[in-house]
């Protein structure tokens, strides 16, 4: 041991060893810093739902209790077009429905089992005296929606005052742009242009008890969506006269006026996460 110490003392390049040691220490520190903190990931156990327990949309819809009566007329083209949109709306909103084609079927005698009635007819003549049955049901606390632009005739005249209408004619008004109330839709409070607009709205004037949520953005100001209380219930009327997919959201918002609570999913939405650029 003493001999080894003498050799170290006699070594002429002891300063170089110190410098070399410093470099080795710095290298070790840099290596540790570049390597990062090491960690051990815990094993994850993934649990998948059995395929036979997955509930498909069509199955879920069939299990819903029918709370909405939908009246259509297969002989009216716009009724068929509107039902295509409303069928999807009711699926998205998880609303159970009973569908009645008044061209072949009779509406139920008792409407008390339903919370809402949606009438997808512009010509109400196939309903005949059932128009009054629906209005009486609304007066007792029901909620009904006329989703198509109505054609003025004898049966419409029977209920137009109950719908909040004080004056009407046999003419239709042009709809080139729709202005929405700010409390009706997200993005409301301004007007939206309508591509290929035409005379699609029934020219009417409403009473003060009617609350208007959308109207034609022109000098006529024809009301396009409104609600009117009647007795213990209410009517909702869509008067814009467009039945394409692009207007599905307007129908859904109108339907939500019938009930205290409405749920509608955000569709066609995407989230993108960008990193390392």
Give the predicted meaning of each segment.
Residues 2-22, 31-36:
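N-terminal Sec-pathway targeting helices
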Residues 35-60:
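Ser/Thr/Pro/Gly-rich low-complexity linker/stalk segments immediately outside membranes or between
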Residues 60-78, 269-273:
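Short hydrophobic beta-strand segments
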Residues 64-68, 143, 200-269:
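A glycine-centered loop/beta-turn motif at secondary-structure junctions
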Residues 69, 99, 116-119, 144-147, ...:
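Structural recognition of the beta-strand scaffold that forms the well-ordered cores
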Residues 76-153:
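Helical hinge/lid and interdomain linker segments adjacent to catalytic or ligand-binding clefts
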Residues 118-125, 241-244, 276-277:
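The substrate-binding groove and active-site-proximal loops of carbohydrate-active enzymes
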Residues 124-189:
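A glycine-rich, often tryptophan-bearing local segment used as a flexible ligand/cofactor-contacting loop or short
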